[in-house]
Amino acid sequence: PPAERRKSVSFYPVLNFDVIVVGAGPGGIPAAIRAAQAGAKVALVEEDLAVGGAPVDMYVTTLFGQPSVGLSKALEQELLRDHGLYNYESGTKPKGWRFFLPSAYVRLLSRNIRKEKNITLLSGTPVIGTMVVDKGNRNRVTGVRIYRNGHIQELYAPVTIDATGTGVVAAMSGCVCMYGS
């Protein structure tokens, strides 16, 4: 922000990471965990107070329509093994549909995030802007600006992953975004 605005707004110190993942849902959490396991210092930014994304926010209590491979598949299997909801009246487990309670999903994801010492979770912190370096037709996102506890904070990293589900980071960065078909 311009210098005159900086005087009226309180800023937290700038933080630097190797990877910033915006969106702590079904796409962002596996991305953050795998980056941390590879040795990267990761900021996982979530606008909501709880992690989980749409399965928690909108009570979407089934995972479908996404590839179930790698870490996502392992998390899904653990979730369903420990917390899956089935139709026990019929005595059979369903094929295709996999239901769970959002609270169980939050517990599973939170536990897996806490296991990774290289992840800094910043929940309740909406992204309010992006920092973009102009490189002609190859602009590069170098960081995000978040609103945290009544203060603004800038996070920088060589890699920023937009896992918001809505493409808000891409849109804020000037990318052409299309929704639907």
Feature roles, as predicted:
Residues 19-43:
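N-terminal Rossmann-like FAD-binding beta1-loop-alpha1 element of flavoenzymes
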Residues 22, 155-165:
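Short hydrophobic core segments
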Residues 131-154:
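Conserved beta-strand-loop-beta-strand element in the redox core of flavoprotein oxidoreductases
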Residues 162-181:
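Glycine-rich loop(s) and the adjacent beta-strand/alpha-helix scaffold that form part
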